[in-house]
């Protein structure tokens, strides 16, 4: 199974680019973040023409996640459990069927800036809820992938200029500790297991020529349960997408 995650930064604004990548890369399963549309405005038919089943958890203007699979999806969940008042569309989960089913979770973790505000508190609370939910799923002992835009820079090797991010929520000790807490449940960072080379970024800001100067960060991750990690054969970052016309500021993993 080839599984991809991509923060597309508005699926409708970049639909031509997104579809071109799907036609070329042809992942079996993909989770998308920041689709920035309600369910009814998601271009479902365009993906169905490429052979995908579609599940969407959208929101007007902001956030929004989707899951696309060449095989049917079962047990679909929209929204992260643990806070019924949370209306932000950041979580989607499904079991992708087939001879070797996989539970796939797509997340768009809160940015959290500025630190010291309710936005940072929400980020940490969201990560704690994710941790608790994953702990409930792990006893199922099934292949599980938690992929998406984590908005966390795990290690110094994952940022070109660490000093520029010291005051940012993505690089705070609390954010990084919460990411490690997920790993400490027994989850494997797919990129670190398959490659691990420094300087492999998934995001370059639109500002100040970040792409041209390779001033990037690695914040898009896939964490694998033991059963999924046993099946890991490789990881690739499609950094060439950042140079395409009208690109997202993220690239597919």
What residues fall within each predicted segment?
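Short, acidic/polar
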Residues: 12-24
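Active-site-proximal beta-strand elements of phosphoester/diester hydrolases
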Residues: 1-10, 101-116, 147, 250
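Structured beta-strand-rich core segments of catalytic domains in phosphoester-bond hydrolases
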Residues: 35-38, 42-114
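Active-site beta-strand/loop signature of hydrolases that rely on acidic residues for catalysis
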Residues: 6-7, 22-40, 104, 133-156, ...
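Surface-exposed cleft-lining segments at the edges of enzyme active sites
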Residues: 81-82, 109-127, 163-168
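Short amphipathic alpha-helices and their capping/turn segments at secondary-structure boundaries
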Residues: 20-22, 90-99, 129-142
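Metal-dependent phosphoester-hydrolase catalytic domains
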Residues: 24, 41, 76-83, 156-253
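Active-site environment of divalent metal-dependent phosphoester hydrolases
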Residues: 11-13, 37-41, 115, 153-154, ...
């Amino acid at each position: 199974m080839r599984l991809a995650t991509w923060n597309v930064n508005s699926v409708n604004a970049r639909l031509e680019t997104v579809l071109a990548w799907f036609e070329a890369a042809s992942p079996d399963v993909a989770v998308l973040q920041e689709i920035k549309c309600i369910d009814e405005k998601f271009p479902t038919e365009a993906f169905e023409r490429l052979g995908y089943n579609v599940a969407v958890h959208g929101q007007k203007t902001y956030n929004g996640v989707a899951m696309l699979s060449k095989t049917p999806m079962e047990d679909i969940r929209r929204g992260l459990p643990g806070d019924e008042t949370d209306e932000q569309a950041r979580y989607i989960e499904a079991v992708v069927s087939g001879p070797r089913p996989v539970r796939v979770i797509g997340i768009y973790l809160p940015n959290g800036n500025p630190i010291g505000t309710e936005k940072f508190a929400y980020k940490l609370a969201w990560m704690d809820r994710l941790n608790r939910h994953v702990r409930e799923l792990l006893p199922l002992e099934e292949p599980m992938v938690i992929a998406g835009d984590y908005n966390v820079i795990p290690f110094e090797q994952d940022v070109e200029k660490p000093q520029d991010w010291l005051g940012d929520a993505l690089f705070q000790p609390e954010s990084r500790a919460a990411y490690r807490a997920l790993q400490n449940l027994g989850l494997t960072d797919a990129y670190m297991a398959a490659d691990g080379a420094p300087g492999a970024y998934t995001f370059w800001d639109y500002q100040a020529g970040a792409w041209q100067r390779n001033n990037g960060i690695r914040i898009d991750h896939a964490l694998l349960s033991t059963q999924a990690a046993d099946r890991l054969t490789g990881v690739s970052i499609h950094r060439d997408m950042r140079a395409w016309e009208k690109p997202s500021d993220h690239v597919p993993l």
